[in-house]
UniProtKB/Swiss-Prot annotation:
GO terms for molecular function: lyase activity. HAMAP family: Hydro_lyase (MF_01830). It comes from the Bacteria. The lineage of its organism: Bacteria, Pseudomonadati, Pseudomonadota, Alphaproteobacteria, Hyphomicrobiales. PANTHER family: D-GLUTAMATE CYCLASE, MITOCHONDRIAL. Belongs to the D-glutamate cyclase family. Keywords: Lyase. It comes from Rhodopseudomonas palustris (strain BisB18). InterPro entries: D-Glu_cyclase, Putative_hydro-lyase, UPF0317. Its EC number is 4.2.1.-. The keyword Glycoprotein does not apply. This is Putative hydro-lyase RPC_1666.
Length: 271
């Protein structure tokens, strides 16, 4: 595993891997977060003005598979102590996306210049958490093997609407042999707060994916002849919904570049 360092922290007392990961992001020394800080929960990010926060919270409650909330800030507060005492939502991800009227207008490495006192941050569970459990059972995770971002796709599966928020579910994909796919269903069912069991196996066209080799987000990965694509609900769904709703202003993470928290993956297992 690559060791990440942040200027000013060399020689310090031993630091949690999750804290080291955030410091590296803060210093611009992390290019992606898949496989980073093993054992620690990573999260998707959606930041909205206070006047839209209640509707978005309701949207997440009505769509728990793609949008399981694991943390939420107070209005105007960039800290979420339940996820990490030193955590700063404005600086601690490798890259962000800034949205205006449904269009992405910037992709900065921090959002200090975009932060406002009326913003509320939502952190949504990420499938990277259950990947640790899959790998512990010796199931292959292709995007980690290839050193790329997980492929993600917009689907024809409609989310339940809430206020201005409505749109398609986004899914992440991992290719597996059929017998391994069955085992993956069993393993990931234990993690409902990070998307849980798959929403679809095989036949990508039946959920509106026209070309499996051209993901809408992330990077394509190899699918071997004896494998099938396995699809999980994905926390990038809010980005598709924010774009569809054309909200005046929002901030999200850049797909595949997550917030590393101090929560342990094992804390999220229900069995």
């Amino acid at each position: 595993m690559t060791v990440l360092t942040a200027p000013g922290f060399s020689g310090a007392a031993p630091t949690l891997p999750s804290v080291a990961a955030r410091l590296a992001c803060r210093a611009g020394n992390a290019e992606q977060t898949a496989g980073l800080a093993p054992g620690y929960v990573q999260g998707n990010l959606a930041i909205l003005p206070e006047n839209l926060a209640a509707s978005f919270h309701r949207f997440c409650q009505q769509n728990p598979k793609p949008c399981p909330i694991i943390g939420m800030s107070e209005v105007g507060d960039p800290k979420i102590p339940s996820l990490g005492l030193d955590l700063d939502i404005r600086t601690d991800l490798p890259r962000y996306r800034v949205w205006r009227d449904g269009e992405m207008v910037d992709e900065p490495t921090d959002i200090m210049a975009h932060w406002r006192e009326d913003l509320v941050a939502f952190v949504i569970g990420c499938s990277f958490s259950f990947e640790e459990a899959l790998m512990a059972d010796e199931l292959p995770i292709r995007h980690i093997e290839q050193g790329v971002r997980v492929p993600m796709y917009r689907t024809n599966i409609a989310c339940a609407p809430a206020g201005p928020f409505a749109g398609p579910m986004v899914v992440s994909m991992r290719p597996l042999k059929p017998k391994d796919a069955i085992r993956a269903v069993q393993i990931t069912s234990r993690f409902p707060s990070v998307h849980g069991a798959p929403v679809h196996l095989g036949l990508p066209q039946s959920i509106g994916i026209k070309d499996i080799a051209k993901p809408d987000y992330g990077d394509p990965v190899q699918i071997k002849d004896d494998e099938i694509p396995v699809f999980w609900a994905c926390g990038v769904t809010p980005q598709a919904v924010i774009a569809a709703a054309r909200v005046p202003f929002a901030i999200t993470h850049s797909p595949g570049l997550m917030l590393v928290t101090d929560l342990k993956n094992k804390q999220l297992a229900v069995l």
